[in-house]
From Swiss-Prot:
Annotated signal sequence range: 1-22
Paired cysteines (S-S): 36-51, 41-70, 49-66, 52-59
Top-rank lineage group of the source organism: Eukaryota
Tissues with expression: expressed in flowers.
Official protein name in the record: EMBRYO SURROUNDING FACTOR 1-like protein 4
Keyword Transmembrane helix: no
GO BP annotations, alphabetical order: suspensor development
Gene: ESFL4
InterPro entries xref list: ESF1_brassicaceae
Keyword annotations: Disulfide bond, Signal
Amino acid sequence: MKSSHAYLVCILLLSLFSLHQCVRLERSNKIDMSVCVHEICGGVFDGGCYCCPKTPALCWADIQFCTTYCQSQT
């Protein structure tokens, strides 16, 4: 009976350690969604354009204007 208790405690500790590692990994992998994404756009924007990730239909040729607009949307 004691060996089964030790086995369950061991499984619990391994599970808690795995969960702790996942939380640490998740915190370090946060993506900053306020930064504009460089896209290839045709027509007016020959060198490409910058779009907000949340609204990909709105794109601008100037990265500074896009960054200002994307930050105001959050």
